Curated annotation (Swiss-Prot):
The keyword Protein biosynthesis applies. One of its GO terms (biological process) is leucyl-tRNA aminoacylation. This is Leucine--tRNA ligase, cytoplasmic. The keyword Protein biosynthesis applies. It comes from Dictyostelium discoideum (Social amoeba). It is found in: Cytoplasm. GO terms for molecular function: aminoacyl-tRNA deacylase activity; ATP binding; leucine-tRNA ligase activity. Keywords: Aminoacyl-tRNA synthetase, ATP-binding, Cytoplasm, Ligase, Nucleotide-binding, Protein biosynthesis.
Length: 1058
């Protein structure tokens, strides 16, 4: 297949990029003072991790920042878009070590055993979380392929030769290899970055290292960094915390804290536990619960009959009956005799302990029994579940099943006395709802059994939310007090008295990049004190949200939720790549904690470092050691010039000028998955360190991007790197497809065919412009005196206005459709309506305006058009000024277009009926076509529209009454009763029209005459519809007998064919 068009487009793209490079188009420095006419604009994007080439998933987010930057440049702003390369943490080290082990084990190049490799698949947890918490449930396992496949093969999949792969066994090689590729790939896409300010992270770069050390010294001085025992996701292989970016599976997963209730096994002892009991040891079943305050209502304990259980000895001699998986977690939480060590005294199936008698703490029932539950997940909690049927729909459903089904009891040899005597025990009263919330929800939702999973999940959320927010204890020492007040008190008392213990585990499966399934460990570590323990800091950060722009209500809501649950965050690790804690050098700062305010480092990086690695000083002539924390305080905090400083104040002033000019961040663009960690840390740390004027102004979040409707996956081959995309579709073809992929916080979709089509359209448009310019003197000139001129000029000006709004809101897909598709449709319409007699000035205006409007999305194409027009650098032109807009002419034009569309649809119906049974090729052109218009609505419809106008709120763009209230009001009117059948259908149609067109849709008449508008366009309409002529008649002019069959209304004529 010929690649001529692709080659043509890529050739001019390269020319444009070379010109940008030679002109240093995107390099920009601070001014001595702000320029009100040309304000600064700083955009940043989370630096990507340097363990592979960039793919369209990365670039989908990058282009949101890129589009905004190019738009702001056109708006006359001085824009800085810097970019850096993240290398901190375990991923690079883990991959390098893995590769080294493969070479040692299998040779170089390695000869691997022939086995089926099964890469980890992307998963979404099906297990219910605490309804009161907010956790990400999606992981990106496929693209990371932690311990699932050989590292050598992963490197091959990145296009690296077998000769070079061994170099990557040294983690330092990664830091030198991928950053240059990342830069060159983005240059291929035409991204407008000031590359002088780029840097790599870790202590390899002494300048960045000194910056991060200063950051943590500042946080510690402010009391934000503390030391103590904390729960965190832990890699047992690496023997340290496993942060999000160090995971092959489970990104976003955090610890889930449970209370393990100690249900003591009493006589008669099950056979499988008798030997242990004979040794005088106390044996406990240990269900994990999120609701310790409900333990008063225990009626039984659930186990999975086919589940694999063990009796594990704890450090204090207690024996816990649970799954081995949970015992493994306990061994990292100082509950067993040694870290990672757990002694199993017996193994058995759940069926072996059915019917065991238990003494349950707090329970009103003195003895409860072990019963079967078939829906227990052995990979969640301890595999043991306590039963509180008053407030847990799952428990109530399972208990009802056992009570109602004798065969089910017989199947598991369950005695009646273990089940039938036990009734629901009311323990929590929810005013206005029930004191047995699970029973009420079970009945209200029509749940039939424990297998009604979706309904039970719904009921569980309902009961948990109502119980926590509105519930009042009705039993125990705290009767009469709200659940939300006493939940923690009851839990703490149970732990203190030895009736329960704290326990934590990952909310879902986490696999480290070293290949092990992670646990939750309780360990001494440095942590950042996010959350309720520093409520002043938390409230300060929450207050920031009020003054920020988030571009969508959903994004802001996610921040509110994240700030609600965010808690202390472990910020140290034992090894990997990164910066050492200044006051405790044996620890490194983890990868999400060293990347919260690095945007400030961009402002001075080009002066400090002479290259991306910081291996030599930059123009300021300052060494890393000279950049002490006191220097950073002067530059970034406005503190006095430090005594005995090795750097002159003049040099530090130059750094300070850059920082104070560029800060704060005007827009931070990121994937929405980072709201739950990085972006919230970003807000917290800015609030702690910087004064109010340097707080971020806006955050723009987006979802993941799919590829051709499917999740991107190397294992399935549905994967596209940036360099491959540019090679296949060109830079602008890729950019247009990325803009068209979607704008919301939900997942978007990059479509190959869109990229191909975009490439072809760009090529076609270049050809059209060239042909047009070659014959421009043949176009009509003189005054713009035709209605078609007015319409086209107004459409151009209106698109200038509307596309500016779309860009400002970061609605880039809307902007694309306006400036590329709608604008070209307007040109094509102008060409047809003028019968190929377009005006020279308007055609040239169209070409220039389209180039300017599409520049943020397709800058190479735009600059090419400007070159063809002989106008030089497109950025010098700035955003086009919109001239006068004749809205009345646009209304008429839209009316004509809609009428043509409706006419064609109606004509097709007529022709289909006429051609039924006729030979192929027969035509059914009507002898006479009539368009019937009406200047007014029927009286009852006028009344409806006038009423709706009175209850429409312009500010909120909504109606102040709902449909039920509207119906009640209108149906109470005597004159509406004859129209009862059609009334609400008309109301619904009117409301929909308002949503699409605004309050104007409620006007009872048009601002223009339909008859004259149609007759003025008769030639165009006939040509478009292939008619010889048509008539226009007023509704009142047609015979009364025909009026009942049709009902035109203003703006929506009807049609007749004879």
């Amino acid at each position: 297949m010929s690649t001529a068009k692709l080659d043509f487009v890529r050739a001019y793209e390269k020319e444009v990029q070379n010109k940008w490079e030679s002109d240093k188009q995107f390099e920009i420095d601070a001014l001595d003072a702000p320029d009100a006419e040309h304000p600064k604009y700083l955009a940043t994007f989370p630096y990507p991790y340097m363990n592979g080439r960039l793919h369209v998933g990365h670039v989908f987010t990058i282009t949101k920042a890129e589009f905004m930057c190019q738009f702001q440049r056109l708006m006359g702003k001085r824009v800085l878009f810097p970019f850096a390369f993240h290398c901190t943490g375990m991923p690079i080290k883990a991959c390098a070590d893995k590769l080294k082990k493969e070479i040692e084990q299998f040779g170089c190049p390695p000869v691997f055993p022939v086995i089926e490799e099964k890469p980890i698949q992307e998963v979404t947890t099906a297990v219910k979380e605490d309804p009161l918490s907010f956790k990400s449930k999606k992981t990106k396992a496929v693209a990371k392929s932690g311990g699932a496949v050989y590292q050598w093969k992963i490197m091959q999949s990145l296009g690296i030769s077998d000769e070079e792969i061994p170099m990557f066994a040294d983690s330092a090689y990664w830091l030198n290899y991928f950053p240059p590729h990342c830069e060159s790939d983005l240059k291929l896409l035409g991204v407008g970055v000031d590359w002088r300010r780029s840097f790599i992270t870790t202590d390899v770069n002494g300048y960045y290292d000194s910056f991060v050390r200063w950051q943590f010294e500042s946080l510690k001085a402010l009391g934000k960094v503390k030391y103590g025992k904390r729960y965190s996701i832990w890699s047992t292989i690496d023997d340290q915390q496993c942060a999000d970016h160090e995971r092959a599976q489970g990104e976003g997963v955090g610890p889930q804290n449970y209370t393990l209730i100690k249900l003591e096994v009493v006589e008669p002892i099950p056979e499988c536990l008798k030997e242990i009991h004979s040794q005088g040891k106390k044996i406990y079943l240990v269900p994990g619960t999120l609701r310790p305050e409900t333990m008063y209502g225990q009626t039984n304990c659930w186990i999975l009959p086919t589940g694999k259980y063990g009796a594990f000895e704890m450090a204090n001699g207690d024996i816990f009956v649970c799954t081995e998986r949970s015992a493994r977690n306990m061994s990292y939480q100082q509950m067993t005799t040694g870290k990672g060590e757990y002694k199993c005294l017996a193994k058995f199936e759940g069926s072996d302990i059915l019917g065991a008698a238990l003494k349950a703490p707090l329970a009103i029932n003195p003895i409860v029994y072990v019963l079967p539950m078939l829906t227990i997940d052995e990979n969640k909690g301890t595999g043991v579940v306590t039963s509180v049927p008053s407030d847990s729909p799952d428990d109530y459903a399972s208990l009802q099943d056992l009570k109602a089904k004798a065969p089910l009891r017989a199947k598991f040899s369950i005695k009646d006395e273990w089940v039938l005597p036990f009734e629901v025990v009311p323990i929590i009263d929810i005013p206005g709802y029930s004191n047995e919330s699970a029973v009420r929800a079970y009945k209200d939702l029509g749940i039939k059994s424990q297998n009604d999973r979706a309904l039970l999940d719904q009921a569980k959320d309902l009961c948990y939310q109502k119980g926590f927010n509105d519930g009042v204890m009705s039993v125990g020492p705290y009767a009469g007090r709200k659940v939300s007040e006493v939940k923690k008190i009851i839990k703490d008392e149970m732990v203190a008295s030895g009736q329960a213990v704290d326990y934590s585990e990952p909310t879902s499966k986490v696999v480290s990049r070293s290949g092990d399934e992670c646990v939750v460990a309780l360990s001494d570590q440095w942590y950042i004190n996010y959350g309720d323990d520093d409520i002043e800091w938390k409230n300060q950060t929450i207050k920031q949200l009020e003054s920020m722009e988030f571009y969508s209500a959903e994004t802001k809501k996610k921040f509110e939720i994240a700030l609600g649950w965010m808690n202390q965050w472990a910020c140290s690790r034992s090894f990997g790549l990164g910066t050492h804690l200044p006051w405790d050098e044996k620890f490194l700062i983890e990868s999400l904690s060293d990347s919260t305010i690095y945007m400030a480092f961009y402002t001075v990086a080009h002066l400090l470092q002479g290259d991306v690695n910081g291996s030599k000083p930059g123009s300021a002539g300052i060494t890393p050691k000279q950049m002490t924390s006191a220097c950073w305080d002067y530059v970034l905090m406005g503190k006095p010039y430090p005594e005995g400083c090795e750097v002159s104040e003049e040099k530090l002033k130059e750094l300070k000028k850059e920082f104070t000019y560029w800060y704060p961040v005007d827009i931070r663009v990121s994937g929405a998955d980072l709201i739950q960690n990085h972006l919230t840390f970003f807000l917290y740390t800015h609030a702690a360190i910087f004064e109010k004027k340097f707080q971020p102004k806006s955050i723009r979040a987006n979802g993941f991007v799919n590829l051709n409707g499917e999740k991107m996956s190397k294992s399935t081959g549905n994967f596209l790197t940036l360099v491959d995309s540019v090679a296949k579709f060109s830079a602008d073809g890729t950019r247009v497809a990325l803009a068209d992929a979607g704008d919301s916080i939900e997942d978007a979709n990059f479509v190959d065919q869109t990229a191909v089509t975009s490439l072809l359209k760009l090529h076609t448009q270049i050809q059209w412009v060239q042909e047009t310019l070659d014959s421009i003197d043949k176009f009509r000139s003189g005054p713009l005196d035709r209605i078609q001129d007015t319409i086209f000029e107004s459409e151009i000006n209106n698109i200038i206005v509307e596309s500016e709004k779309a860009y400002q809101k970061t609605n880039f897909r809307d902007a694309l459709h306006l400036v590329f598709f709608d604008l070209q449709n307007a040109r094509d319409h102008y060409k047809v309506t003028t019968l190929d007699q377009m005006h020279k000035d308007l055609v040239l205006r169209f070409i220039e305006v389209q180039a300017l409007l599409i520049y943020p999305i397709a800058p190479h194409f735009a600059q090419k058009l400007f070159n063809m027009l002989g106008k030089g650098n497109i950025l010098s032109a700035g955003w086009p000024k919109a001239g006068a807009i004749d809205y009345e002419a646009l209304k008429k034009n839209n009316y004509v277009q809609q009428t043509i569309y409706n006419f064609r649809m109606k004509l097709q119906v007529y022709q289909k009926a006429k051609l039924k049974g006729k030979p192929a090729g027969t035509k059914a052109i009507p002898d006479q076509s009539t368009i019937i218009v009406s200047k007014s609505y029927p009286k009852w419809q006028q009344d409806v529209l006038e009423y709706l106008a009175t209850i429409y709120n312009e500010d909120s763009k909504s109606f102040t009454k709902d449909n039920n209230a509207i119906a009640e009001e209108l149906l109470s009117r005597e004159e509406m009763k004859p129209h009862k059948k059609n009334l609400m259908g008309f109301v619904a149609s009117a409301i929909q029209n308002v949503k699409e067109s605004g309050k104007d849709a409620l006007q009872t008449s048009l601002s223009f005459d339909e008859t004259s508008t149609l007759t003025d366009n008769i030639d165009y309409i006939c040509k478009t519809l292939e008619l010889t002529s048509f008539d226009v008649k007023d509704f009142n002019e047609i015979p009364q007998a025909s009026q009942s069959k049709i009902q035109p209304i203003p703006g929506k004529p009807q049609f007749q064919f004879v």
